[in-house]
Design a protein with these regions (language model features):
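Functionally constrained cores in energy, signaling, and assembly domains
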Residues: 2, 13, 21-24, 70, ...
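Active-site neighborhood of thiol-dependent amide/isopeptide-bond enzymes
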Residues: 9, 77, 141, 145-201
Length: 201
């Protein structure tokens, strides 16, 4: 299926701005599941400086600076993207989670170098023995990885309550686990932390 995508961002400032610096991450990335047929990015007013580069993950960035007085900034992109849909693998056919976790122990095999970086703790998502215990209820010995991941997701949905007033972007994961409530980002962090606690990316 091919999509024609129009994106428009408009900033209207309360007072004139003399200098502004921006990073736009708007260019669709070619992957095994999608190809970018065309892409254009227009910026008004015209930037004084403009540079494009790829970030660590291969996403295209447009860094630009407007160094003249302006009261509004408009960014318009047009993209044409073709998406290829493949049926997902049957969860039961995925390898046992222990086999996958073993791939990420030293020495790391060449085929897992890219996902290896996601095994480690990050500021918002840290592995713990408590989370490993919670995750192991979904990952008994020999459980296919995708079966366990689906069960973990189901349990998080059942065990935690969606509450937009319970957390902020800075709420530590430990507090989310203690309160058993939060929002989508908290539950995503929880799922990732559970997987990391088992040595999975």
């Amino acid at each position: 299926m091919t999509y024609n995508i129009l994106h428009r961002t408009l900033y209207e400032y309360a007072a004139p701005v003399t200098v502004s610096h921006h990073v736009a991450r708007l260019e669709p990335r070619p992957t095994s599941m999608q190809s970018r047929e065309s892409f254009s990015l227009k910026i008004f007013p015209e930037p004084t400086l403009r540079k494009e580069r790829a970030d660590y993950f291969g996403n295209q960035l447009c860094l630009f600076s407007i160094q003249e007085v302006h009261k509004k900034l408009e960014i318009i992109t047009h993209s044409r993207v073709t998406v290829r849909r493949e049926p997902p693998p049957a969860p039961e056919t995925s390898p046992a989670w222990e086999e996958v976790a073993a791939l990420f122990r030293d020495p790391v095999s060449p085929e897992v170098v890219e996902p290896y970086q996601f095994v480690f703790d990050s500021p918002q998502v840290r592995a713990s023995f408590e989370l490993a215990d919670y995750a192991l209820e979904s990952f008994p010995k020999g459980t296919p990885l995708l079966v366990g991941a689906r069960e973990l997701t189901r349990r998080i949905f059942k065990d935690f309550k969606y509450d937009p007033k319970a957390t902020t972007v800075a709420t530590p994961l430990e507090e989310v686990v203690e309160k058993r409530r939060g929002v989508c980002q908290d539950f995503a962090h929880l799922g990732i932390a559970c997987l990391r606690s088992l040595g999975l990316p």
